[in-house]
């Protein structure tokens, strides 16, 4: 099915002026969600969103403040407007993602376009709303006009007024990082929680980042985020905790400006996903649908990757990225590493990498990631150093050609690592050389990183300038047929539909933080509601040894999960890039549990969300692409969970064998995380399962159709 009704059904109405209080409405295709638009007494645009009879977003203001004299109307695009026309239409298509949680996605919405003109200045601004069965997306559009050409945004005043002191699952705003544990509390409590951790990177004691998950007292789940973030600053939210109104706060650049714009242009979409069923938030594809179709003509080279890597041993302190202790500073092209003494803890040695290649080959993995292979790690962090890496020169103990040829002989690919140390100018200068080097040596995927303060100095991680850089690195990679896994980049907004070579991001608190003191057990039960709505995450699951000091004595961190929980993540945390992150020797101690990681599929035909409550539990079933087989994953937070599911997603009349990897009765993420059971059972369409999940636990299931 592919229908383009929009061009046929749009009707334009010319309106001289819409009186204050008069309302334009648009409904979702199923009629459940209502979008209302009006002008206030002073001509300010405003909107509201209802789901059935329940309010999701109360009447909320819209518009911009531009750089200039704040007392002058010329600095304001948030008042004195009149409506000069509206148009409406319906659009319905089904498109096929290059990879994803299903093989086809329906994009069906009703649209309302409102044309606005500022009375005194004649400046034009349009607002386009798209109303889906699962929510509303809207954006600002500035047409070609003489009265507004180049302009600089001081503030965007998009509001999201909440129906009371609702519950929020949130992380604090930060210009530098998204790597926070989530907090669950009422809106009125955010200020107090934030006051205990305020730092210079937080713009407000009531500021939060998107994607923001909320729940009203009437039982509505509301998610606020953005889609198609291109040539614009990342949106945070600032809460008026007296009136419970969020307002957009754009990440500033080094000068304090929020955006340099030129008409004609449009902003990213502001998204509001809403439902009375938490599972619908996970099932929403609105963020993807609001992005442009794929711009890569030949996508045959883009494919899912299951990999291992020389990474966790460095994260935990067992080995090091650097080569020597002898160099307080490094000058690339001048420093001679052959004349210094190796410290003996370097992880990326030819010998060690070959062990990972052997492990990958023996266990059916696609690739091996190696970090710390290139010169410069001795002084890479904290110095605002421009020429920090060249991305092509290996350390003396990393024989790139030998490793390349050895991996090829074993049928294993290598994944490149480009840590930039946030020296973005340096990375862009070297980007084409680095990508050419990759292709010449058989690397088809790269993990990039942006740890540290930005160069150019003073630039923010999520400003307009940096947003443009992250996308530039992806679009340039596409020219070389390179897949990108970007860490420390701006959080995703669905651009993987347009550029599917962006196969993953980090952009949230990943598994590495389990080695930096630990994460809350419920963290993996909130990420699917927040971070993952914009695109897949390289979460790096699969940790089997939770007591890190057993192999890295100086690290006393504990991984707050059970083995069964770690297995479930390969299903609940969707990504076309999945890592078995632990050390090979830890997998060799638990070969029966490791079998699930080896078996779990990477491509899916459909996904079902069986149980969900933010921060508490998530249970997901996915059907293997071009198969009748399924995998199920269930994760539980700090309180544990009794999972009750039906297998009615299985085809009636067929029989299946299920292998269940579950927490043992005495399992607990703190005291007994490695206790698990494995059992097989025969199931069918009418079967049900009641399974206890330990605190920080869960279960994983492999379901194979029994062939006659």
For each predicted feature, which ranges?
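Catalytic cores of secreted or luminal carbohydrate-active enzymes
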Residues: 564-611
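N-terminal accessory beta-strand-rich subdomains and adjacent acidic, glycine-rich linkers
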Residues: 23-297
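Bacterial Sec-dependent N-terminal signal peptides
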Residues: 1-23
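Edge strands and adjacent loops of beta-rich recognition modules
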Residues: 98-106, 594-622
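Aromatic- and carboxylate-enriched substrate-binding clefts and catalytic-loop regions
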Residues: 371-558, 562
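An acidic-aromatic substrate-binding cleft motif
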Residues: 262-357, 363, 367
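Carbohydrate-binding surface patches
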Residues: 614-656, 700-702
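C-terminal beta-strand-rich structural cap/linker in extracellular carbohydrate-active enzymes
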Residues: 680-708
């Amino acid at each position: 099915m592919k229908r383009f009704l929009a061009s046929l059904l749009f009707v334009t109405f010319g309106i001289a002026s819409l009186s204050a209080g008069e309302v334009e409405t648009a409904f979702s295709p199923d009629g459940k969600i209502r979008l209302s638009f009006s002008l206030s007494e002073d001509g300010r645009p405003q909107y509201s969103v209802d789901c059935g009879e329940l309010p999701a977003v109360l009447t909320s203001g819209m518009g911009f403040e531009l750089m200039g004299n704040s007392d002058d109307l010329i600095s304001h695009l948030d008042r004195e407007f009149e409506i000069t026309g509206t148009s409406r239409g319906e659009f319905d298509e089904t498109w096929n993602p290059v990879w994803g949680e299903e093989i086809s996605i329906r994009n069906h919405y009703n649209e309302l376009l409102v044309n606005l003109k500022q009375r005194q200045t004649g400046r034009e601004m349009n607002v386009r709303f798209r109303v889906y069965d699962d929510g509303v997306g809207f954006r600002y559009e500035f047409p070609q006009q003489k009265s507004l050409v180049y302009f600089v945004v001081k503030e965007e005043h998009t509001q999201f007024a909440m129906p009371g002191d609702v519950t929020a699952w949130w992380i604090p705003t930060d210009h530098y990082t998204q790597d926070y544990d989530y907090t669950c509390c009422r809106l009125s409590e955010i200020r107090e929680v934030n006051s205990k951790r305020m730092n210079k990177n937080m713009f407000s004691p009531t500021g939060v980042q998107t994607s923001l998950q909320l729940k009203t007292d009437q039982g509505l789940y509301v998610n606020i985020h953005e889609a198609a973030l291109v040539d614009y600053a990342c949106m945070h939210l600032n809460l008026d905790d007296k009136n419970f109104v969020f307002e957009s706060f754009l990440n500033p650049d080094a000068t304090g400006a929020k955006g340099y714009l030129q008409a004609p242009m449009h902003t990213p979409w502001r998204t509001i996903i809403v439902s009375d069923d938490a599972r619908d938030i996970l099932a929403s594809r609105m963020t993807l649908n609001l992005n442009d179709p794929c711009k890569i003509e030949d996508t045959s080279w883009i494919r899912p990757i299951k990999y291992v890597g020389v990474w966790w041993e460095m994260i935990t302190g067992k080995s090091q990225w650097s080569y020597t202790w002898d160099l307080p500073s490094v000058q690339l092209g001048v420093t001679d590493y052959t004349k210094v003494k190796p410290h003996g803890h370097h992880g990326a040695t030819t010998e060690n990498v070959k062990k990972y290649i052997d492990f990958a080959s023996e266990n059916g993995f696609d690739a091996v990631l190696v970090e710390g292979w290139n010169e410069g790690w001795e002084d890479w962090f904290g110095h605002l150093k421009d020429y920090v890496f060249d991305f092509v020169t290996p350390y003396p103990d990393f024989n790139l050609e030998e490793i390349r040829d050895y991996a090829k002989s074993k049928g294993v690919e290598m994944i490149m690592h480009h840590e930039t140390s946030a020296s973005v100018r340096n990375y862009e200068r070297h980007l084409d050389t680095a990508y050419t080097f990759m292709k010449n040596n058989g690397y088809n995927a790269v993990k990039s990183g942006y740890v540290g303060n930005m160069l150019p100095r003073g630039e923010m991680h999520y400003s307009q300038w940096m947003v443009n850089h992250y996308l530039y690195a992806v679009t340039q990679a596409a020219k070389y047929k390179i897949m990108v896994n970007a860490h420390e980049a701006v959080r995703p907004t669905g651009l993987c539909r347009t550029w599917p070579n962006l196969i993953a991001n980090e952009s949230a608190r990943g598994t590495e933080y389990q080695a930096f003191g630990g994460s809350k057990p419920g963290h993996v039960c909130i990420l699917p509601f927040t971070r993952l709505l914009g695109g897949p995450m390289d979460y790096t699951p699969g940790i089997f040894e939770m007591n890190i000091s057993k192999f890295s004595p100086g690290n006393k961190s504990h991984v707050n999960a059970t083995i069964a929980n770690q297995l479930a993540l390969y299903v609940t945390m969707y990504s076309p890039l999945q890592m078995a992150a632990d050390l090979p020797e830890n997998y060799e101690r638990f070969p029966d549990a490791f079998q699930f990681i080896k078996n779990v599929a990477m491509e899916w035909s459909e996904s079902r969300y069986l149980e969900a409550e933010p921060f508490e539990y998530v249970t997901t079933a996915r059907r293997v692409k071009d198969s009748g087989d399924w995998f199920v994953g269930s994760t539980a937070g700090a309180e544990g969970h009794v999972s009750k599911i039906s297998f009615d997603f299985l085809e009636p009349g067929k029989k299946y064998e299920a292998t269940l990897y579950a927490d043992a009765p005495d399992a607990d993420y703190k005291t007994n995380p490695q206790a698990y059971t494995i059992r097989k059972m025969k199931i069918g369409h009418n079967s049900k399962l009641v399974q206890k999940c330990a605190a920080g636990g869960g279960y994983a299931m492999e379901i194979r159709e029994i062939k006659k």
